[in-house]
Amino acid sequence: MPTLMVQGTTSDAGKTTVVAALCRWLARQGVSVAPFKPQNMALNSAVTVDGGEIGRSTALQALACGLEPHSDMNPVLLKPQSDCGAQVILRGKVHGNMDALDYHAYKAEAMNSVMASWRDLSARYDVVIAEGAGSPAEINLRANDIANMGFAEAADCPVLLVGDIDKGGVFAQLVGTLALISDSERGRTAGFVINRFRGDIALLEPGLDWLTEHTGKPVFGVLPYLHGLVIDSEDSVSAAGTSEAGALKVVVPVLPRISNHNDFDPLRLHPGVDLVFVGTDEPIPPADLIILPGSKSTRHDLQWLKQQGWPEAIQKHLRYGGKLLGICGGFQMLGLKVEDPEGLEGEVGTTKGLALFEMVTRMVPGKQLRMVNGGLTSHVASTAVTGALKGYEMHNGVTEGAALVRPFAELEGRPDGAVSADGQVAGTYIHGVFDEPAACKAILAWAGLKTQGEQSVDYQRHRLQQLDRLADQVDQCLDTDRLRSLLQL
């Protein structure tokens, strides 16, 4: 079955967005299509229908296709644990920890997983839209490449090269990338897509004509800068720019190994929430609600919290009646200690927690990966909210202790998380707690948002609307006849 690969001249050129747009455009025409990312490096991941995990951006592209995410869609996922090492996920399951040099040597073997997943997807769907990583012209990474042209050559598929004009220098990026790849790779580069253009397209046309004449490659189209586009971000942490007067102030520390910060996307969109992310050495502002996010290295990030003065700020926050919520790794930090006897998240050892819950977390092999459904308990909501939670668990830790007798949620017959006796502190292992409107409304009411009215955001509906907006741009701005020909449709 046809495969088309989208590569970029740089990181953040718009590959993820273009792939999502193409997937949605094809799916709306009734084409059976699936996304594919051979290798991804990200701490934001999603649980798959087959009990694995893949990068969050690929899960978004699956949604664009109308599919549940599957491990075959992202066969190699690298989750950084330090500047020089990462946890390697192969076809959804933890393979082990590797430093950069070891992984570079391992890539030839990882390619077997990549090709096996691609073949399985190709057998199940009519079209596969693949996404590269970074740039195909990184000279130091070209040996044993599995993320860009290495995969395209093995799969014998055409490539679209995306450049971001908003950053400037797009013609140099496109021409320079072609100059640095091999003759064979240039031959399979079908053409260009220019992304994030602002202004009158007539002013750009002389440059487009020159680009085609100079390279012999067509420009498939120019996508505009889409103001107000909000879709899942995999790498960057950013807050919304506007909120209503009297909004609930929510503060989140940007942990060095923060993971799954997409948990906060519904709060970014909520008009009644003023969401603030606080980074290293930044002042900690007053808040109504502090949320400790997920972490790929709980003990490391717990030490960072202490160095940055968060325990003292949290104690002051609670004395003045503020609320505190911990999610996954953030929940683990609220206990007496976090033990890692096998060094699953870094060095072997034990780190004292914030001691706000009578509980202990122990890191054990065998990551918990599962989608969950359930409801909030009356400990955190004014009354129990049944059927309001849909999310996922993704953690190594096993947590035990007296604090768990007051659970945060009930998940199909089993408890999750904890709530303090005074109701000020809560914790949960569930990612996606704000995704469903009823749960989001109840948690924000617990945190102090008095009047919500019709403010709650239907996050899933919003995501689909944004994907449809992207697909509309394919119809309006790209050469769809040329695309169909490339895809043999």
Curated annotation (Swiss-Prot):
Query: Which residues are in the GATase cobBQ-type domain?
Result: 247-439
Copy the pathway line from the protein's UniProt record: Cofactor biosynthesis; adenosylcobalamin biosynthesis
Which Pfam families does UniProt cross-reference here? CbiA, GATase_3
InterPro entries, per database record: Class_I_gatase-like, CobQ/CobB/MinD/ParA_Nub-bd_dom, CobQ_GATase1, CobQ_N, CobQ_synth, GATase_3, P-loop_NTPase
Q: Which GO terms describe its biological process?
A: cobalamin biosynthetic process
Family membership noted in the UniProt record: Belongs to the CobB/CobQ family. CobQ subfamily.
Q: What is this protein called?
A: Cobyric acid synthase
- Organism, by scientific name, is Marinobacter nauticus (strain ATCC 700491 / DSM 11845 / VT8)
Q: What gene is it encoded by?
A: cobQ
